[in-house]
């Protein structure tokens, strides 16, 4: 049975404790006083796989409508979402990664941790200096830097960067 969520601004809240606990145990959302707060990528992914039903008032919102609403808030949402959904399908558990200057930090198993920078092939330019700056942000953590490049067809390529000390 799908959890019930309520669209509040650009966030989705799951207020039912049982639903919230079930999702949180799968590394979705962030607990708050108002319920489990899902960020847009999580909410859309859960809708698409049938684990969440989102409503605004009494009106059920389809995954397509949810995508449209999130794009209104952030035109780059589909690019980030493509990476988020791909990581989830590959067994990773992505969370927001802003403190690393990346879109996501993701976990898989006990030891695998990555910080994922998302770039859109046709729009985002970056230099070797940018890569060094991103590496500095993850330096001293257990995270490995991964750059996800999304093309106009939403095909993804992942590149792993690390600093080689000689």
Swiss-Prot record:
GO terms for molecular function: nucleic acid binding; tRNA-intron endonuclease activity. It comes from the Archaea. Pfam families: tRNA_int_endo, tRNA_int_endo_N. CDD domains: tRNA-intron_lyase_C. InterPro entries: tRNA_endonuc-like_dom_sf, tRNA_intron_Endo_cat-like_sf, tRNA_intron_Endonuc_cat-like, tRNA_intron_Endonuc_N, tRNA_intron_Endonuc_N_sf, tRNA_splic, tRNA_splic_arch_short. One of its GO terms (biological process) is tRNA splicing, via endonucleolytic cleavage and ligation. One of its GO terms (cellular component) is cytoplasm. Belongs to the tRNA-intron endonuclease family. Archaeal short subfamily. PANTHER family: TRNA-SPLICING ENDONUCLEASE SUBUNIT SEN2. This is EndA-like protein.
